[in-house]
Amino acid sequence: MARFVVVALLVLLSLSGLEAVQRAPKIQVYSRHPAENGKPNFLNCYVSGFHPSDIEVDLLKNGKKIEKVEHSDLSFSKDWTFYLLYYTEFTPNEKDEYACRVSHVTFSTPKTVKWGRNI
């Protein structure tokens, strides 16, 4: 019984230690296909390498939140960090600016990464 209690305590301590680890997300914004003005495409925001899992991701058009956005299920890598893909249909043109805004405990303010059509 004492051995079980010791093992249980060690497991709990190791799990609580995982919550203390914080890793900032890496943010990548790109289109599914090479951008052509007036041609429908998909805008992707891939957020990876973050911990803990609580995160808020918004796709933006001219600084305003795009409402019709889909995303993958929250998944984790071998190192126990998390990753997600947010995406939406869009039609690029010369005047509109697109970006991905991410809020995470590792950022003091939300971080915004702009989409560059040549990336």
From Swiss-Prot:
Instruction: List the SUPFAM superfamilies.
Output: Immunoglobulin
Q: Which CDD domains match?
A: IgC1_beta2m
One cellular component (GO) term of this entry: extracellular region
Q: Which residues form the Ig-like C1-type domain?
A: 25-114
Keywords from the named record: Disulfide bond, Immunity, Immunoglobulin domain, MHC I, Secreted, Signal
**Keyword Acetylation found:** no
* GO biological process terms, semicolon-separated: antigen processing and presentation of peptide antigen via MHC class I; immune response
PROSITE patterns reported for this sequence: IG_LIKE, IG_MHC
Task: Give all cystine bridges in this chain.
Answer: 45-100
The record, for InterPro entries, names: B2Microglobulin, Ig-like_dom, Ig-like_dom_sf, Ig-like_fold, Ig/MHC_CS, Ig_C1-set, MHC/Immunoglobulin
- N-terminal signal peptide: 1-20
Establish whether keyword Hydrolase is in the entry: no
Compartments where found: Secreted
Instruction: Please describe the quaternary structure of this protein.
Output: Heterodimer of an alpha chain and a beta chain. Beta-2-microglobulin is the beta-chain of major histocompatibility complex class I molecules.
- Record's function text: Component of the class I major histocompatibility complex (MHC). Involved in the presentation of peptide antigens to the immune system.
The record's similarity note reads: Belongs to the beta-2-microglobulin family.
Its protein name is Beta-2-microglobulin
Q: Which organism is it from?
A: Callimico goeldii (Goeldi's marmoset)
Species classification: Eukaryota, Metazoa, Chordata, Craniata, Vertebrata
